[in-house]
């Protein structure tokens, strides 16, 4: 196991949930259910309300691979929108182009999806993009660049991920043409997150 996987493994154990949605971390949690450095029943000392909020915020931060500044800005945007702030926050994270590439099965992980976008492999509405943080809207279309080598890579990823995760109902994936259409924003019950978004809202609201 390389250093990056070890670091991810420690995060999964710290949070007690498989935030990276990969089978190997489910196995790790079964084998080592305690947080790093903790053993037996004393998994964690009593956590303050602030500590709980911080943990939920960190879960989302590491799940989606965003920086502190990015998450703060996403929260500010979610608060400006109509509706429930926590729901808006998660929907904005889900509609990031790197996350859509991941959800569509074009990448085996979100980190891999960010790499794919950064390398210019993805087209957005016919134009090459290299910014993983772009927020997609209804009727946006993303497509794999017209190169046989790239298409072969993505098709291989689709094959690997097809049995591991279900496609979201708010996107339409054409596996033959390797494109994805955003049909609408996701609703809260369509977002498979392991974090408590209300605690994240409370965390940022106290610092606004």
From Swiss-Prot:
RNA-binding in keyword set: yes
GO biological-process terms attached to the record: ribosomal small subunit biogenesis; translation
PROSITE patterns, per database record: RIBOSOMAL_S4, S4
Residues covered by the S4 RNA-binding domain: 95-157
One GO CC term on file: small ribosomal subunit
InterPro entries: Ribosomal_uS4, Ribosomal_uS4_bac-type, Ribosomal_uS4_CS, Ribosomal_uS4_N, S4_RNA-bd, S4_RNA-bd_sf
Alphabetical UniProt keywords: Ribonucleoprotein, Ribosomal protein, RNA-binding, rRNA-binding
Function field: One of the primary rRNA binding proteins, it binds directly to 16S rRNA where it nucleates assembly of the body of the 30S subunit. With S5 and S12 plays an important role in translational accuracy.
Subunit-structure text: Part of the 30S ribosomal subunit. Contacts protein S5. The interaction surface between S4 and S5 is involved in control of translational fidelity.
Family the UniProt entry places it in: Belongs to the universal ribosomal protein uS4 family.
Protein name, UniProt field: Small ribosomal subunit protein uS4
């Amino acid at each position: 196991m390389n250093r990056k996987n070890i670091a991810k493994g420690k995060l999964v154990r710290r949070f007690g949930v498989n935030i990276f949605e990969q089978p190997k971390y489910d196995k790790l949690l079964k084998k080592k259910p305690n947080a790093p450095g903790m053993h037996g029943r004393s998994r964690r000392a009593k956590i303050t309300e602030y500590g709980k909020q911080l943990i939920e915020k960190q879960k989302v931060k590491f799940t989606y691979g965003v920086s502190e500044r990015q998450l703060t800005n996403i929260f500010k945007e979610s608060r400006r929108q109509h509706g429930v702030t926590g729901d808006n926050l998660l929907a904005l994270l889900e509609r990031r182009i790197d996350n859509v590439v991941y959800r569509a099965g074009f990448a085996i992980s979100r980190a891999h999806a960010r790499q794919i976008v950064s390398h210019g492999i993805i087209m957005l509405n016919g134009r090459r993009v290299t910014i993983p943080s772009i927020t997609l809207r209804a009727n946006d279309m993303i497509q794999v660049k017209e190169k046989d080598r790239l298409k072969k890579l993505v098709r291989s990823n689709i094959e690997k991920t097809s049995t591991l995760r279900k496609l979201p109902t708010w996107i339409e994936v054409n596996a033959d043409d390797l494109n994805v259409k955003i049909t609408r924003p996701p609703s809260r019950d369509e977002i498979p997150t392991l974090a408590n978004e209300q605690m994240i809202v409370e965390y940022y609201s106290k610092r606004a």
